[in-house]
């Protein structure tokens, strides 16, 4: 186990050998399934389980992501003794789409994501044999998971958030953005169309990406979408942007309602989500008497948005922190709720 964690620090040195060997063998052990989400949308998920594991991590990905991208993270957690479940949110990955153009990143209500996660938890997570249940959520998945826990307090033993989407970086004054979004909301042709500056999925060169400094991981993730057109998602709709901004506001408004042990990891070189909202969330949790781990975000120095797909030096720091955090919340006692 300790060697496993040490390997995180040098994996990129032989990344191709790892992905084509041990990681491919591990991925073949997956069990893929689906459940019916809000409005009868099929929601896909994947699971990795072993009889001797008594803890589970539910991974809640970010916008456009599919569970196929999370094989490496699942491998690392599984080999430390965690079962792993990963959900593909509605409108992306292998789950059902909502609009005729499958590349459009869209949701009717942000709460639909939250309700899907609640149904998933009730059907797949809560009835399971595990002694401890954790969430590891990234970006949009962080907003979804946090809203879920605010509405269903006590169902999860601990949550780790990487670059959670509590606010979005929009390169215009907020009043102007709101005017545009409100106007688009009243005009369906624009409401359900690509937000300005975005469009259908296309492969972007590594040199201009703002997600990771790891060339190997970036190219591997790009290959998933290049090889399987069915999982491609492009830019968001105006309505998705509006719903997501409102969701971030809901997260902050309810920050004091949830006492779940929380670790919040922040990317120092963030370009996608608004780090100021992480700081505000932590302040609100502290004021409510439920401070996050350390009382503030754990800043991963030098990291772009996708912290767990970063270069080994940054990824290993984050992953060690997450695993150590989950291990600190592994005592047999506790008052976790069994109701969702």
UniProtKB/Swiss-Prot annotation:
**Family annotation (Gene3D superfamilies):** alpha/beta hydrolase
Record protein name field: Lysophospholipase L2
Membrane topology listed for this record:
Peripheral membrane protein
Which InterPro entries is this protein grouped with? AB_hydrolase_fold, Hydrolase_4, MAG_DAG_Lipase
GO cellular component: a single term: plasma membrane
Q: What is its EC number?
A: 3.1.1.5
Q: Which PANTHER family does this one have?
A: PHOSPHOLIPASE-RELATED
Q: Enumerate the subcellular locations listed in this protein's record, separating them with semicolons.
A: Cell inner membrane
Record's miscellaneous remark: In addition this protein catalyzes a transacylation reaction to produce acyl phosphatidylglycerol by transfer of the acidyl residue of 2-acyl lysophospholipid to phosphatidylglycerol. Lysophospholipases from various sources vary widely in molecular weight, substrate specificity, and subcellular localization.
- Keywords for the protein's UniProt record, in alphabetical order: Cell inner membrane, Cell membrane, Hydrolase, Lipid biosynthesis, Lipid metabolism, Membrane
Source organism: Escherichia coli (strain K12)
Please classify the protein's predominant subcellular localization into one broad category.
membrane
Q: Taxonomically, which superkingdom?
A: Bacteria
Task: Indicate yes or no for the key word Cell membrane.
Answer: yes
Instruction: Say which enzyme class the record assigns.
Output: hydrolase
What GO biological process, any one, is recorded here? glycerophospholipid metabolic process
The GO molecular function terms of this record are: acyltransferase activity, transferring groups other than amino-acyl groups; lysophospholipase activity
What is the reaction catalyzed? a 1-acyl-sn-glycero-3-phosphocholine + H2O = sn-glycerol 3-phosphocholine + a fatty acid + H(+)
